[in-house]
Amino acid sequence: MASLGSSAGGRRPTVLLQIALFVVVAAIIINSSVCLGATAVHDAAASGTGALDPNVPAVPTPGGAGQPYTGRGCRTVYGCRPPAGGQP
């Protein structure tokens, strides 16, 4: 250790300080993420809207409520054939 000189003694507190700073920042980020997620879930449950409401679909239907899904049409690029008598 004596061959490392005085610079090694100065690096150790710096590395420990960097590790401590990393731990503090990680704890703040993790804590705020959990709190924000819990707040969003609580707000959705309390208001009765959102993905937690069984009467409201989590994903909107493409054609609107009660409308059939028409898709993107039939093109030769997709290799499909329109049904007899009309458009798909």
Swiss-Prot record:
Keywords: Membrane, Transmembrane, Transmembrane helix. GO terms for cellular component: membrane. Signal peptide: none annotated. Residues 36-88 are extracellular. It is found in: Membrane. The chain crosses the membrane at residues 14-35. It comes from Triticum aestivum (Wheat). This is Protein WIR1A. It is a single-pass type II membrane protein. Residues 1-13 are cytoplasmic. Associated with pathogen defense.
